[in-house]
Amino acid sequence: MTLIFAVSKRTDFDYMAFADQDDIWLPRKLYAAVDKLKDSGETASLYGSNQTLYQDGKEGELRFSCPLDTSLKHHINRNEVSGCTMVMNRKLVTAIVSRPCPPANIIDFRIHDAWVALVAILTGTFIYDPNSYILYRIHENNTVGIRKTSIKERLNRLLLRGNNGEHRANLRSNTASVLLEYYPDIDEEYRAVLEKYAYYRKSMKYRLALLRDKEIIKATGENPLVFRLK
C-alpha cells in the first residue's frame, strides 16, 4: 500500500497496475484492462480479471468458472479478485491517496488489493473481466489464494480469526468504521451496509439489521448460526 502512496506523487501516468513477480503476464494483459477503463472518464475505476492456474510449468483451468460478485456486501467480507490482475485509473489512485493510509491491522488482514477494491466500489466502479490474461503460479509461498493452507491458517479460519490472531468480526467492523471515516460522502445504500458492520456491537438497531440481512450472511461464506452468534 505504501508503494501506491509513493508512486502517486508522479503526475505522468493515466493508469496504475500491481505486479507480482511470481506471476506471468500474457501479451494482452494491460491492453485488455485499458480497453475496459478508457471510457471511465472522471469515474474512479478499477479493473480486475480472472486468472489461469499455472503449476509445475503447466497451464491449468481458469481460477473462477462463474462471474464474481463485485458488490460491497461481498467485498467487505472477502476479496476474490487478485491484486496482480488489477489496473486502476488515475481518478481511483487519487481517491485512495487523498486519504490516510489505512491502519496496519486492516492491511495485514485484508491486504492492499482488498482495500483498493472497496474504495473503487464506494467511490466509482469495479469492472470484472471473466477472461484471463495472466498465469497464476501455485506454490507453497503464495501469500493468498490457491496454495495449500497450513494447520495454523486452517485453525484460524475455523475460529474466524485472521492470521494475526484478531477476530474476523472485529476486523470487518474496523474496516467498515475506517471506510466511513475516510469516505463520508458515499451513497446512502453503501453507508447503510457499512454502518451495520461498524456499529452492530454497540447498537441493537444495527445488530438486528445485520442479522436480518440475508445477502450479507450469504456473502460471508460462514455458517449462518456461527455468524449470528458472533
What is the role of each PLM region?
Residues M1-S150, G162, L229:
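Nucleotide-sugar donor-binding/catalytic module of glycosyltransferases
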Residues R99-N105, F109, R137-K230:
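C-terminal subregions of glycosyltransferases and related glycan-biosynthesis enzymes
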